[in-house]
């Protein structure tokens, strides 16, 4: 009788998934047409002639708001599994989750008092 280990399909899938990028990348680079010229260095704006430079500077405040969003989003994602298992985990998990929520809140209040949210 032929017995298959529990994880053989996983290892086979992992092997095939890890072989796809190194095989597909050279195939696409050799088969794709390569056009050289000054048009390659211009920005594409839906067939319309580009106006101005493609490289513009963003204010640093944009990155501050974006980083606050990413941190709060990561915090929400990390709290979701805890919320799903709230009844089974008990008081120690509640204490850890409250500490995990308190740290970004304290950091946000500190940044707000220092004026990090002011757009000036």
Curated annotation (Swiss-Prot):
Entry-linked InterPro entries: NAD(P)H_OxRDtase_bac/plastid, NADH_UbQ/plastoQ_OxRdtase_su3, NDAH_ubi_oxred_su3_sf
GO CC terms of this entry: chloroplast thylakoid membrane; NADH dehydrogenase complex
GO biological process terms held by the UniProt record: photosynthesis, light reaction
Membrane-spanning ranges: 9-29, 64-84, 89-109
Entry's Gene Ontology molecular function annotations: NADH dehydrogenase (ubiquinone) activity; quinone binding
Location(s) in or outside the cell: Plastid, Chloroplast thylakoid membrane
Annotated signal peptide: none
Membrane topology recorded in Swiss-Prot or TrEMBL: Multi-pass membrane protein
Keywords of the record: Chloroplast, Membrane, NAD, NADP, Plastid, Plastoquinone, Quinone, Thylakoid, Translocase, Transmembrane, Transmembrane helix, Transport
Top-level taxonomic group: Eukaryota
Pfam families: Oxidored_q4
Keyword ATP-binding: no
E.C. number(s) listed in UniProt: 7.1.1.-
Enzyme class: translocase
Reaction catalysed by this enzyme: a plastoquinone + NADH + (n+1) H(+)(in) = a plastoquinol + NAD(+) + n H(+)(out); a plastoquinone + NADPH + (n+1) H(+)(in) = a plastoquinol + NADP(+) + n H(+)(out)
Classification via HAMAP family: NDH1_NuoA
Family: Belongs to the complex I subunit 3 family.
Function: NDH shuttles electrons from NAD(P)H:plastoquinone, via FMN and iron-sulfur (Fe-S) centers, to quinones in the photosynthetic chain and possibly in a chloroplast respiratory chain. The immediate electron acceptor for the enzyme in this species is believed to be plastoquinone. Couples the redox reaction to proton translocation, and thus conserves the redox energy in a proton gradient.
Assembly and binders: NDH is composed of at least 16 different subunits, 5 of which are encoded in the nucleus.
Protein's UniProt name: NAD(P)H-quinone oxidoreductase subunit 3, chloroplastic
Organism: Huperzia lucidula (Shining clubmoss)
